[in-house]
């Protein structure tokens, strides 16, 4: 199982969703990163 983790500028981590397929997880991370850039949020996303 692959999980998306949201990491804030303060270092706090929030586990968002779990995915069976790593490709699907990375697609969601890509969309989240684009949305964060549009909102100018200082957030990082990883798949673990």
What are these regions (language model features)?
Residues 3-7:
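A short beta-strand micro-motif
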Residues 13-17, 26, 30-48:
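Short, mixed-charge low-complexity intrinsically disordered segments
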């Amino acid at each position: 199982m692959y999980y998306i983790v949201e990491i804030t500028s303060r270092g706090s981590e929030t586990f968002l969703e779990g995915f069976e397929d790593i490709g699907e997880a990375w697609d969601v991370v890509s969309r989240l990163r684009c949305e964060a850039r549009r909102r100018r949020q200082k957030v990082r996303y990883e798949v673990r």
